[in-house]
Structures are given as C-alpha cells and as structure tokens.
C-alpha cells in the first residue's frame, strides 16, 4: 500500500474554482468504498482542497480516477476539468507537502496559525467518518507534531499574521488609519456585523476583541449564533434574522464567514443600507463568497476578499522561513525512516513464521511421545522462551536496516541462510511466542506452563 495526495490550491487555480472543488470534495467519503482507495482524508481551507489517500501501489491511478470522479459528481464542473485541476504527489512528496502546509509555509499568508488546526480537524473528521487508514493517521499526526515544533522553536508566525489579521489591516488602510491610536479609536467606535460562524469566524471575533472592538453583532442563518457567542465569552451580540436588516444599515464593517450557497447581491446590500452614504467596509472571508464581487461598485463601499488578502500578505523574515524549512526537512526524514522501518514487518513475520514452524513440529514430536507431562511442559516453556530471545535481535536489526534503506540486505540474508522469501505484503502485528498449554506465574514472577 502507498500514500499519495491530490492537490488543488491557490498556486494553480483561482479561488472560485477552489471553492467549487472544495464543495465537491464532500463526495469523497461516501464514494470511498468503490474508489479503489483504502483510506482518504480531505483537507479544505480558504485557498486549497487536498485529498490524501492510500491505495495499493499498482492501483494509485485507478484510485485517483475514482476519487476525482466522486468530486466531479458533486460539482457542476466537467469530469475532465476536475481531473486536470489536481496535481498528484507520490508518497515522499506528499509527506513534505503536508508538513509544509501544516506549518504555514505554503499558505497565502506565510506562517499563518490557523492552518495547523485545520490539518488536525481534517484528520479528526476523517476518523469520525471512518475513512482514515492507519498510514494516513500516522502521516497527519506527524504533520501536527511538526507544526508544534516549528511554532515552539522558530519565529515563523510569531507576529500572529493570519488571513483575518491581514484582512483587518487592509480595512484600516482603506480608511486611511495609519497610526495605532486612530486604528484603536476606529474599532472601539465601529459597529460591526459578523455573518456566519464558519472557518474564520472564531479567529475574527478574537481579532476584533484584540483591536478594541466593542459593538459586534453575529448572525448565523443556521441558528448557531447564540452558542457561538456564548462559547467565546458572550461579549458580542447574537442576532436573529429579523435584526439583520437593521444591523446592515448601521454597520461600519460587515464580515462574511458563512460560505453559504447564496450571495448578497449589490441590489440587496444597497436596499438594506436604505440608500445611505455611510462608508462601509465589506470583508468577505468565505471561500465560496458571501458577497457578489459587484458590491465593490456601490458608492462608499470597499470590498476586501481572500484574493485581496493573498496579494497583500506580508513576507515573513527569511531567517524564520529558513529555520522552519530546516525543521520540516528533519521531520520528513524522520517520517520516512519510520515508514521504512515499518516495511521490515513482512520480513520479520516471515522469519518468525519459519522459526515457529520448526519449533511447533519438534514440540508435536515431544507431546506425541511424552504427552503433557511436567518434563515435556518444562521443555516447551524453555524452548519458546529461547525462541523469543533468539528472534529479538534479528527483529531489531531488520527495523534498523529498513530505516537505513538497506532492507534488501536483510531479505537477501533470509533467503540465503534459511530459504525464506519475505512476502511483499503488509504484516500484521507480531507478538510474542505463545505456549500451546495454559501458563501461570511461578513464585519469582516468571511464566510457567500449567
């Protein structure tokens, strides 16, 4: 089995296309059984949709086709367009890519902190849906550990830059607020409406609080506003549907984070504003857009989108980026070594099976001649303990050689010395050698045959 990934992101596609692919990726889980893949985890953020999957080595292309056909079936995009939108990464490239994504090196805002949580939640969602295979779990857990290491040992992201912070910085710039005092005065006096409780809503509310905002209304079409506000200190105001029109009319800033199917049109926004000329800043953080881009043409309305954020994102210090990349390099090599070590399982099991076969045949002869006498049981106990001890060092060496990329030497030795051909399939967990008869502990705590 091998791990691979299908990647579509802001590097290659416009965000509208990414949004449509992201919506289609919800079809991956239900389609998994017939896709040819043994497992899948979908990572969808504001600027990427990526499918991490596991399949038999010879079946990767078939699994790729099956997964992307599931995406296409859940979108209005032609099948061939969906297939062309995704790049395919092999196992080694997949690990490096996910680790770089998880630490924020591949983000529109380099070093952003939200992405690590999104990687973690993607794995959790796949585990709850039953689509995360063991190798995918290990891959994502390694990526999460790497993100923590980068956060602890480098200055990447130390400035707290994120999609939300850059968007709010842009809002300040558009209003000509150049000094800290003016910026804080603006947020303290501004009336703000947050629409939706989507991916960036929690971070947005926290950022607004940090900047001194005091008047924030939150509306959720799905009715989650009250719980959302309560979970975050209760300082904002949850708004029902009947209060939204008035909130829009009074707002200085409206922030969209719902990702719903319907967009607010220029006509509807103008109607809700009651034709007023009060300056309004609209920040659209929804990947699928909460606002029609044409609202930017309305008088006294400034529109900030995810594309605006991408273009305005500041560059991280080169030293911090270099340090983060070095940690990613180390983490990728550690992950690869661990995977190579696991590749020794089949050879270890083959040696154990061969050795136990010899032992069991000899024990059958002993039992046939002497039955379960005390002497025979003592012999069996001693031989099984000896076999466990003899197999320990070869098993350790197999893992070590595999981690060093030299497993072929071990397999050649097995074939040359014992005539064992290691099976080319994943091995189940290999335990200790068990006795054929019940066992109990003697007075010194050692197991003995009953």
Curated annotation (Swiss-Prot):
Database matches in Gene3D superfamilies: Glutamyl-tRNA reductase, N-terminal domain (3.30.460.30), NAD(P)-binding Rossmann-like Domain (3.40.50.720)
Residues holding substrate: 45-48, 107, 112-114, 118
Matching SUPFAM superfamilies: Glutamyl tRNA-reductase catalytic, N-terminal domain, Glutamyl tRNA-reductase dimerization domain, NAD(P)-binding Rossmann-fold domains
GO molecular function, one term: glutamyl-tRNA reductase activity
Positions in coiled-coil regions: none
Amino-acid positions noted as binding NADP(+) in the UniProt annotation, renumbered to this chain: 196-201
Annotated site residues (Important for activity) in this chain: 97
Keywords: NADP, Oxidoreductase, Porphyrin biosynthesis
Classification via InterPro entries: 4pyrrol_synth_GluRdtase (IPR000343), 4pyrrol_synth_GluRdtase_dimer (IPR015896), 4pyrrol_synth_GluRdtase_N (IPR015895), GluRdtase_dimer_dom_sf (IPR036453), GluRdtase_N_sf (IPR036343), NAD(P)-bd_dom_sf (IPR036291), Shikm_DH/Glu-tRNA_Rdtase (IPR006151)
Record EC number: 1.2.1.70
Pathway: Porphyrin-containing compound metabolism; protoporphyrin-IX biosynthesis; 5-aminolevulinate from L-glutamyl-tRNA(Glu): step 1/2
Pfam families found in the cross-reference section: GlutR_dimer (PF00745), GlutR_N (PF05201), Shikimate_DH (PF01488)
Note: During catalysis, the active site Cys acts as a nucleophile attacking the alpha-carbonyl group of tRNA-bound glutamate with the formation of a thioester intermediate between enzyme and glutamate, and the concomitant release of tRNA(Glu). The thioester intermediate is finally reduced by direct hydride transfer from NADPH, to form the product GSA.
Entry function: Catalyzes the NADPH-dependent reduction of glutamyl-tRNA(Glu) to glutamate 1-semialdehyde (GSA).
HAMAP family: Glu_tRNA_reductase
Family that this chain belongs to: Belongs to the glutamyl-tRNA reductase family.
Domain observations: Possesses an unusual extended V-shaped dimeric structure with each monomer consisting of three distinct domains arranged along a curved 'spinal' alpha-helix. The N-terminal catalytic domain specifically recognizes the glutamate moiety of the substrate. The second domain is the NADPH-binding domain, and the third C-terminal domain is responsible for dimerization.
Stated name of the protein: Glutamyl-tRNA reductase
């Amino acid at each position: 089995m091998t791990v691979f990934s299908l990647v579509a992101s802001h590097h290659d596609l416009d965000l509208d296309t990414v949004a449509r692919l992201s919506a289609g990726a919800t079809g991956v889980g239900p389609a998994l059984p017939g896709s040819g893949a043994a497992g899948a985890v979908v990572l969808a953020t504001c600027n990427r949709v990526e499918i991490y999957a596991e399949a038999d080595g010879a079946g990767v292309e078939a699994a790729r086709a099956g997964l992307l056909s599931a995406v296409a079936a859940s979108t209005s995009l032609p099948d061939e367009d969906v297939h062309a939108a995704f790049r395919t990464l092999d196992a080694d490239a997949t690990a490096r890519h996910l680790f770089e994504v998880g630490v924020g090196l591949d983000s529109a805002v380099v070093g952003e902190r939200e992405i690590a949580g999104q990687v973690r939640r993607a794995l959790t969602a796949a585990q709850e849906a039953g689509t995360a295979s063991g190798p995918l779990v290990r891959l994502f857990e390694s990526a999460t550990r790497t993100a923590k290491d980068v956060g602890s040992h480098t200055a990447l992201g130390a400035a707290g830059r994120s999609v939300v912070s850059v968007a709010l910085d842009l809002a300040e710039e558009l209003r000509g607020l150049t000094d800290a005092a003016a910026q804080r005065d603006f947020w303290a006096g501004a009336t703000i409406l947050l629409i939706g409780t989507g991916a960036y809503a929690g971070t947005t509310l926290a950022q607004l609080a940090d900047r001194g905002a005091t008047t924030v209304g939150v509306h959720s079409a799905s009715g989650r506003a009250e719980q959302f506000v309560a979970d975050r200190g209760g300082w904002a105001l949850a708004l029902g549907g009947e209060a939204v029109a008035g909130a829009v009319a009074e707002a200085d800033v409206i922030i969209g984070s719902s990702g719903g199917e319907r967009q607010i049109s220029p006509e509807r926004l103008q109607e809700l504003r009651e034709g007023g000329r009060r300056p309004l800043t609209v920040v659209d953080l929804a990947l699928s857009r909460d606002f029609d881009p044409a609202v930017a043409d309305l008088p006294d309305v400034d529109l900030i989108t995810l594309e605006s954020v991408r273009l305005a994102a500041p560059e991280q210090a080169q030293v911090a980026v270099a340090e983060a990349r070095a940690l990613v390099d180390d983490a990728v090599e550690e992950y690869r070594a661990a995977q190579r070590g696991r590749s020794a399982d089949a050879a270890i099991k083959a040696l154990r099976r061969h050795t136990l076969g010899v032992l069991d045949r000899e024990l059958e002869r002993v039992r046939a001649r002497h039955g379960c006498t005390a002497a025979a049981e003592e012999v069996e106990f001693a031989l099984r303990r000896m076999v466990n001890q003899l197999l320990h060092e070869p098993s350790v060496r197999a893992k070590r050689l595999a981690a060093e990329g030299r497993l072929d030497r071990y397999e050649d030795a097995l074939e040359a010395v014992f005539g064992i051909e290691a099976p080319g399939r994943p091995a189940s967990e290999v335990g200790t050698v068990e006795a054929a008869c019940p066992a109990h502990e003697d007075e010194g705590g050692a197991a003995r045959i009953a």
